[in-house]
């Protein structure tokens, strides 16, 4: 049986990357929430 997670960097960046997050209002919310929490990595 094939597993569901088949990692690839391109789709990963496209969906969860910093630039992608900054494109939308909600994405910017995500980044700011992670900044406020003090996350070491804000995005992928």
Curated annotation (Swiss-Prot):
Disulfide links within the chain: none
Keyword Ribonucleoprotein: yes
Keyword list, A-Z: Ribonucleoprotein, Ribosomal protein
Highest rank taxon of the organism: Bacteria
Cellular component, GO annotation: ribonucleoprotein complex; ribosome
GO biological process, one term: translation
Protein family (similarity comment): Belongs to the bacterial ribosomal protein bL34 family.
Protein name: Large ribosomal subunit protein bL34
Organism: Sulfurovum sp. (strain NBC37-1)
Gene label: rpmH
